[in-house]
Amino acid sequence: MLNNSHLLIIWLFGLISGFNLMITGNTLNYWLAKEDIALQTIGILSFITLPYSINFLLAPIFDAVQIKYLNKIFGHRLSWICLTSTALIFLIYIFSFLDPRTNLVLFTFTALIISFFSAAQDTILSALRTEIVPKESLGFTSGIYIFGYRIGMLLAGSGAIYLSIYFTFNEIYKIFAGLVFIYLILLIVAARYTNSFGLVEERICHSPSFLCHSRGSGNPNNEFFIKRYYSNFLKIFLDSRFRGNDIKSGNDISLAYFIILILIFLVLYRLPDNLINVMINPFLLHLEYDAFEIASVGKFWGVVGAIIGGLVGGFIMKHKNILNSIFLFGIIHALGHILFIFLEINGKNSLLLFITIGIESITGGMTMTAYIAFISSLCQGKFRATQYSFLSSMMGISRSIFPIISGYMVVNFGWQNFFLFTTIITIPSLLILLKIKTKLQ
């Protein structure tokens, strides 16, 4: 039975996940733009968030591997959280002394390592959340988690840009390190007080390794579990709802073709947003908006708009099926990108910025809601968690790899053509969606 203390822990999970993502994501992007780093370089550095795209590969390790000393004190899950949080505290503090203008290579490498530990912790927290929460309460607690996630994004995103009016980003990242430390203490205290982590310890497997030890003679099945997870990963994915009557032609070639279509769609559908997200900070600074305006409208209002869009999208999807919704939302959202062209033509205009960010964020929240619902609808059977992790990683690939060309596009073709491209590139994904729809009907 869940109580308020358990809900607080779920909220803390979301808070730190959203907070950590922004540290190496949009906030870092703003820092680089503020330091007048070349647009091409800013685009390339979008790959820093790549660990979030492959974190599903780490999941079996965190399930099976037991940390030698920390496990005796904190237990299995909490010991991993302590390890990753401690690493993040030290790495973020070290990062706060680096300057992207004088040593960009070391700056980038450190940010990538921070991103790795952030993604690792995100994986652990996601697994723990599903273990603490009863199945019938997952929907409600997901809302608590997402609320915490958005608050974390606001703190490390809009909050950091507000602080940049008074502090340097080196000082701000020192504050970040302190906040991660405070979070760790709060989580340890809350976990000990509620014994939430103890509820799932007996369900966790352990395995000996050079980083860990086993209780007694250990469990030799854990090494087999990890090897089996990786060797059969594609089989796990293929043995889903895609077999059988869900595809008109049930042969393997048709199955492979259908899966490829889905993967391409998942990458392309999110690509326009991901291109814009990498360049939005340089764009707003190019239009000479100050830190207060960017934090208030570009970030805070953007998050509020995304929340509103998620609610609107969820309401509409009660009356329309997922495929029709994701198609409709995609068209509306693509048209919203055109407003950035008007913003570039008109120059600095606070009202137009408010309207542009509002429409972009609300329609973006709608598409994201439908996108997640679509991924969830594809996952069935006993391996649905693995399927979901794999499919959602396509969103991460779209966010981390393809936007590396965004800076080159702006430099060579200009802002207006860049935003026009983000509108047009939606068309291929919608055509693929129509093809997927015919396959499923």
UniProtKB/Swiss-Prot annotation:
Keywords from the UniProt entry = Cell inner membrane, Cell membrane, Membrane, Transmembrane, Transmembrane helix, Transport
Q: Which InterPro entries match?
A: AmpG_permease/AT-1, MFS, MFS_dom, MFS_trans_sf
Gene3D superfamilies (alphabetical):
MFS general substrate transporter like domains
The answer to keyword Aminoacyl-tRNA synthetase applying to this record is no
What cellular-component terms does GO give this entry? plasma membrane
NCBIfam families reported in the protein's UniProt record: 2A0125
Q: Which family does it belong to?
A: Belongs to the major facilitator superfamily.
Matching entries from PANTHER family are given as: MAJOR FACILITATOR SUPERFAMILY DOMAIN-CONTAINING PROTEIN 3, SOLUTE CARRIER FAMILY 33 ACETYL-COA TRANSPORTER -RELATED
Q: What is this protein called?
A: Putative transporter AmpG 1
Supply the source organism for this entry: Rickettsia felis (strain ATCC VR-1525 / URRWXCal2)
Lineage per the UniProt record: Bacteria, Pseudomonadati, Pseudomonadota, Alphaproteobacteria, Rickettsiales
Q: Which gene encodes it?
A: ampG1
